[in-house]
């Protein structure tokens, strides 16, 4: 115990049958491409990575219990055909004893079987440390990228008509998200937004309103933001790039 380690890579790999196709995604929220396990060059795919095997089986490669570690992506092996290797986003400095994330292989006869058995991932992660989770209200979220008062109201109406529980106001409402000087306690002067009024309107429709805040503001203002947002009536915060 107490041994310092600097981890720069893993040797975890997954060899698939020849002819396997991958639903390749280069970055989070990027487009999916159905690709063979060849010709990727230095490109890497996000996780989870879903694969279509020649015999019709569906496979998903993913990770679980990633604690004090870095995320992994998938790249093709330069030496072994039809083989995917784990590529770490960066190096890891860690002190023993330690645990690396689970590397998970899910297999189903149909693609939907991967979803229907996703409790496997839940059970590989640690149990919730919160004694009371009754205040957490899960639901579907509709993103409003058009940051105008009337357009956000229209998004709230849209969500209410379609059984969507939340509307999310994305980046830009308090200023440029990448600037440390942007103040997430106020609406940017160039935005026609009355957030407390929008929260009241959303509540009248049975909708919760959420906002995006980049980590640059969060590290400076978190203790101020949370009580303020509660006062406004916001129901959640999307943390940017944590």
Label every model-predicted segment:
Residues 14, 49-51, 59-61, 102-106, ...:
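Generic structural hydrophobic/aromatic packing signal, biased to beta-strands
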Residues 1-124:
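N-terminal accessory beta-strand-rich subdomains and adjacent acidic, glycine-rich linkers
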Residues 11, 48-50, 156, 199, ...:
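Short amphipathic alpha-helical segments and helix-helix/interface helices
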Residues 90-92, 155, 197-198:
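Generic recognition of flexible, low-complexity loop/linker segments
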């Amino acid at each position: 115990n107490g041994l310092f380690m600097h981890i720069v890579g893993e040797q975890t790999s997954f060899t698939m049958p020849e002819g396997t196709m991958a639903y390749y995604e280069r970055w989070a929220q990027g487009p999916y491409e159905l690709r063979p396990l060849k010709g990727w060059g230095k490109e890497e795919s996000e996780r989870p990575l879903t694969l279509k095997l020649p015999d019709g089986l569906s496979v998903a490669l993913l990770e679980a219990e990633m604690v004090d570690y870095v995320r992994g992506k998938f790249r093709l092996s330069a030496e072994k055909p039809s083989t995917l290797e784990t590529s770490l986003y960066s190096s890891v400095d860690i002190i023993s004893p330690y645990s690396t994330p689970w590397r998970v292989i899910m297999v189903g006869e149909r693609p939907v079987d991967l979803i229907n058995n996703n409790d496997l991932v839940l059970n590989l992660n640690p149990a919730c440390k919160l004694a009371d989770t009754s205040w957490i209200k899960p639901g579907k979220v509709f993103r409003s990228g058009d940051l105008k008062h009337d357009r956000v109201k229209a998004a709230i109406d849209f969500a209410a008509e379609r059984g969507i529980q939340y509307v999310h106001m994305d980046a830009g409402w308090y200023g440029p998200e990448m600037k440390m000087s942007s103040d997430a306690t106020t609406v940017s002067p160039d935005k026609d937004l009355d957030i407390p009024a929008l929260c009241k309107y959303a509540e009248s429709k049975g909708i919760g309103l959420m906002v995006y805040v980049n980590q640059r503001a969060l590290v400076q203002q978190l203790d101020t933001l949370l009580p303020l947002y509660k006062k406004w009536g916001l129901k959640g915060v999307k943390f940017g790039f944590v």
